[in-house]
A protein has these predicted regions:
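Hydrophobic/aromatic-enriched cytosolic interaction surfaces used to assemble or bind macromolecules
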Residues: 1-168
């Protein structure tokens, strides 16, 4: 994932896609070249989010659907789906998505995404993962005033956080 900061010079889809490619290349290096990138549709003047999926994985999903005479009409990144569902509820707070090997932290300020961090998790062990999440929250706490953290996990229970964070 990459946060696409608002710029009045980059309002078209092609310009936003170029920015997303550059940001993902900066984060992922050469692996970014293998991604199919999707952009959200932010309101004018607001930052947006780009998500990348491995092209071969997407092609495999499409082929599997076609082999079963199905049509794959949409593949939606979990972070985008979670943001859509929870953004207004959080208002000033954090959304943490814990996936196998990755921790993604989105800061929401005044109902809009204001920061986004991807972190390769060192383990799936809840206590250690809680420490890594707490470290990211501490490092990013200047960007969002809220102490509310919605934790979405693809497997297992959400880790418990110390330090006054209100988790849901």
């Amino acid at each position: 994932y990459a946060l696409l900061p608002w710029s009045d010079m980059l309002t078209g889809k092609a310009a936003r896609l170029d920015m997303a490619r550059a940001l993902l290349r900066n984060t992922l290096g050469e692996r970014a070249a293998a991604l199919d990138i999707a952009l959200d549709l932010p309101a004018f003047g607001k930052s947006g989010v780009a998500a990348g999926i491995d092209r071969q994985l997407l092609a495999g999903l499409r082929a599997a659907a076609k082999a079963r005479r199905l049509r794959l009409s949409s593949v939606q990144p979990r972070l985008i789906a979670e943001l859509s569902a929870q953004q207004k509820q959080l208002n000033d707070g954090w959304l943490a998505c814990l996936d196998l090997g990755w921790l993604t932290l989105a800061g929401i300020r005044d109902g809009e995404i204001s920061s986004l961090r991807n972190h390769r998790a060192s383990t799936a062990e809840p206590a250690i993962l809680a420490g890594e999440l707490a470290g990211l929250l501490a490092a990013e706490s200047a960007t969002v005033n809220g102490k509310k953290v919605l934790i979405s996990t693809s497997a297992g229970a959400a880790p418990k956080l110390a330090g006054g964070w209100e988790t849901t």
